[in-house]
A protein has these predicted regions:
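C-terminal alpha-helical interaction appendages
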Residues: 1-85
Length: 85
């Protein structure tokens, strides 16, 4: 997960709405089933999906009243903690 990507997609959600991100997730998940994709291509799609799902989680925290910066930091701490386990 990359914080700059999450931050950028949050800006997109603010300017548009999160439905675009949800539809992009659906498209990428569908495309990941293409049998002829190379491993590297699947890895890139997986990384994009991780960042998009992460952005939706951060956006949910913001909608619940958390400050944007605090929401991003909380999310990244949770992700980092999960990786360390």
């Amino acid at each position: 997960m990359r914080l700059p990507i999450i931050k950028h997609v949050l800006g997109f959600i603010e300017a548009n709405d999160e439905d675009w991100v949800k539809e992009t997730i659906e498209l990428l998940e569908n495309m990941s089933e293409i049998a002829s994709l190379k491993d590297e291509e699947i890895e890139v799609m997986g990384e994009l999906l991780s960042n998009l799902y992460g952005t939706l989680e951060v956006n949910e925290m913001i909608k619940e009243g958390m400050d944007k910066k605090e929401a991003m930091n909380t999310f990244m701490k949770r992700v980092t903690g999960a990786i360390d386990k």
